[in-house]
């Protein structure tokens, strides 16, 4: 069970948190689509929460854990598995979790990294539905 708290500006796992007088629990999740680039107007017209972080920090695993749906977001031990902006519908379209490609140590060429930087930058600055970004940090590394 996962919940989102606006008051604490954080996502907590396995802890009921108040949201607008009630509790927000992820009951179901579904992969919707992927974008290789972002254009203003892309998305589904509902609130989006992006998941960002370095390559292989566990962004896709985090989405799977929140949704309690192993395999919803594809994972790999190889950095750079997520190459597109992936949209996942939560609670029958109540909101979207958006899995972003990682930054930093992906085992891809410089041209591919530049494409990702442009895609992520466009999404973060132009999405009209983006309400927050969860940045994952692996505390095991400096």
Residue ranges of predicted features:
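Cationic, low-complexity basic patches in intrinsically disordered or flexible, solvent-exposed regions
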Residues: 8-9
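Conserved G1/Walker A P-loop phosphate-binding module
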Residues: 13, 19-105
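Alpha-helix boundary/interfacial micro-motifs
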Residues: 71-72, 77, 111, 116-118
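Conserved ATPase-coupling elements of RecA-like P-loop NTPase cores
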Residues: 106-111, 142
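Inter-motif core of Ras-like GTPase G domains
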Residues: 112-140
